[in-house]
Amino acid sequence: MALYEHVFLARQDLSQQQVDALVEQYKGVISANGGSVGRVENWGLKSLTYRVNKNRKAYYTLMDLNCPPAALNEMERQMGLSEDVLRFLTIKVEAHEEGPSAMMQKREERSERGSFGDRDRGDRGPRSFGDRDRGDRGDRPPRSFGDAGGDRGPRRPREGFEGGAE
């Protein structure tokens, strides 16, 4: 039997219990056809990069499969017919990864880091908003209103043009 990693996206308007029921349904399909399901990870409701069937978000689920190709084909056929499954992707692997997937590790790192305001700013010191009125780094002198700036000097008047701003 071959080893596969299978990810599918379920509609955003489903509840977590309905997504779990889908997982159980597809586990049953794999076991009925002589395969087994290892790790199952629910990555939760995540934003999609672009709309898929009028959905901006979807429930992501990863399944590690050990099954014959016929079992996988049957599961993918049923997913294609289901209105609850937006997309799915199956990849054949040499061996299943031990421990949590990269997506779950990212989630754990985020929870350890805390919110934006808690992050360490290193040698920059605490963030202050009092110097934001000029919008520069503070290493240049302020410009006066009519100053052209740079090395160009004043602008010469246009030839052959009557009137103007001068």
Curated annotation (Swiss-Prot):
Gene Ontology CC terms: cytosolic small ribosomal subunit
GO biological process: translation
Keyword RNA-binding: yes
Pfam families: Ribosomal_S6
Stretch list, region Disordered: 96-166
Function of the protein: Binds together with bS18 to 16S ribosomal RNA.
Family: Belongs to the bacterial ribosomal protein bS6 family.
Name this polypeptide is given: Small ribosomal subunit protein bS6
Organism: Mesorhizobium japonicum (strain LMG 29417 / CECT 9101 / MAFF 303099)
